[in-house]
Amino acid sequence: MKKTALYPWHEKAGARIIDFGGWLMPVQYSGIIAEHRAVRSAAGLFDVSHMGNFYVKGPRAEEFLQHMTTNDLSRAKNGQAQYNVMLYPNGGIVDDLIIYRIDAQTFFIIVNAGNCEKDYQWLQEHAAEYDGVVLEDHSSAMSLIALQGPKAFDILKKVLPSLDAPSLGSFHFCTLEYSGAELMVARTGYTGEIGVEICMPNEMALPLWEDLLEAGRPEGILPIGLGARDTLRLEMGYSLYGHEIDQDTNPLEARLKWVVKLDKGHFIGREACLQVELNPKRSVAGFVLEGRALPRQGCKLFNSDHQEIGRVCSGTLSPTLQEPVGTCSLLREYQKPGTRVFVEIRGTMQPGTIRPLPFVKTSLS
């Protein structure tokens, strides 16, 4: 089992540790609800060092990545990050990822932990077609910490006073020095709140983690586990690989049309996307249940005539709304907000309603 550089801290703090994609990761510390609410009201600190990260370098690096992904990377300037998707030729999703453009010949990529090896192999298989393109896997040498919440910038200013975080635009990043090491600070996140994600060499993870927690103590900062990370992203309707998106899902049927630029030229999976665009049959939608039963992945959705119309992608009890909420892959004709649906949970039909995503308003909305 793999461990992040912060694993000893998590263990000492009494975190509940689980196996997540081959990594021993904290799922909770004080409790999922308390941690969730801390991020929504104050700030939370996440160890997300299990995420994979690669460099793509060379004079044809941008051309290569344009071929491999759906978004238009030429629109990103140096110092900007871009949410993106890689597809198989049939339009199924290899992974969703963030690409950071350092300069015209240097790109940094963060991918999902469970897809790290698969993604790297997929990129390697196609890089041979582009002379001079070099791939470097830095996943084992780098740590990634996320600071998220409405008070995140107040805390960050105490630890990194040279960073003018509020002036750092959404999906922009910069590099700066901290205790003699270089940090990459990006205004990105997975919670819907103001915040940053910070990439650094492994040896700097613990000092920075402890400095941020100490600086944030007066503001109510908490360390946050994967459990609250999931409830936070689900309240926003953000995709999680293996749930809303996977190898059998086309991005045009998963609320990701905005990152598929069919007019940019050829990319892997473009032809499949063109076919789906002509007649998309389903998409991902949000729903809320009336009772207390929790929807789980794979539960079936039905209309009032008892016809199956979709399946649950993710579900939880929203700590903000105090209602069972979920996302589902749903036939398009049932996606109008207010539409009545029924979710089969343990053999009983639970009534619910389609609701727009995101479910909640945040410091970014």
UniProtKB/Swiss-Prot annotation:
The residue range of the signal peptide is none
Task: Give the EC number(s) listed in the UniProt record.
Answer: 2.1.2.10
The UniProt entry, under InterPro entries, shows: GCS_T, GCS_T_bac, GCST_C, GCV_T_N, GcvT/YgfZ/DmdA, GcvT/YgfZ_C, TrmE/GcvT_dom1
Highest taxon of source: Bacteria
Alphabetical list of Gene3D superfamilies matching this protein = Aminomethyltransferase beta-barrel domains, Aminomethyltransferase fragment, Probable tRNA modification gtpase trme, domain 1
Q: Reaction(s) catalyzed by this protein? A: N(6)-[(R)-S(8)-aminomethyldihydrolipoyl]-L-lysyl-[protein] + (6S)-5,6,7,8-tetrahydrofolate = N(6)-[(R)-dihydrolipoyl]-L-lysyl-[protein] + (6R)-5,10-methylene-5,6,7,8-tetrahydrofolate + NH4(+)
Q: Does Nucleus count among this protein's keywords? A: no
SUPFAM superfamilies given for it?
A: Aminomethyltransferase beta-barrel domain, Folate-binding domain
Q: What class of enzyme is it?
A: transferase
A molecular function (GO) held by this record is: aminomethyltransferase activity
Q: Name one GO cellular component term.
A: cytosol
GO BP, sorted A to Z: glycine decarboxylation via glycine cleavage system
Report if keyword Transferase is assigned.
yes
- Which UniProt keyword terms apply here? Aminotransferase, Transferase
Give me the segments passing through the membrane.
none
Q: Which NCBIfam families match?
A: gcvT, PRK00389.1
> In UniProt terms, what function does this protein have?
The glycine cleavage system catalyzes the degradation of glycine.
Describe its partners and assembly state. Answer: The glycine cleavage system is composed of four proteins: P, T, L and H.
Family designation: Belongs to the GcvT family.
Question: What HAMAP family does the database record attribute to this sequence?
Answer: GcvT
Q: Per its record, how is this protein called by name?
A: Aminomethyltransferase
**What species does this protein belong to?**
Chlorobium luteolum (strain DSM 273 / BCRC 81028 / 2530) (Pelodictyon luteolum)
Organism classification: Bacteria, Pseudomonadati, Chlorobiota, Chlorobiia, Chlorobiales
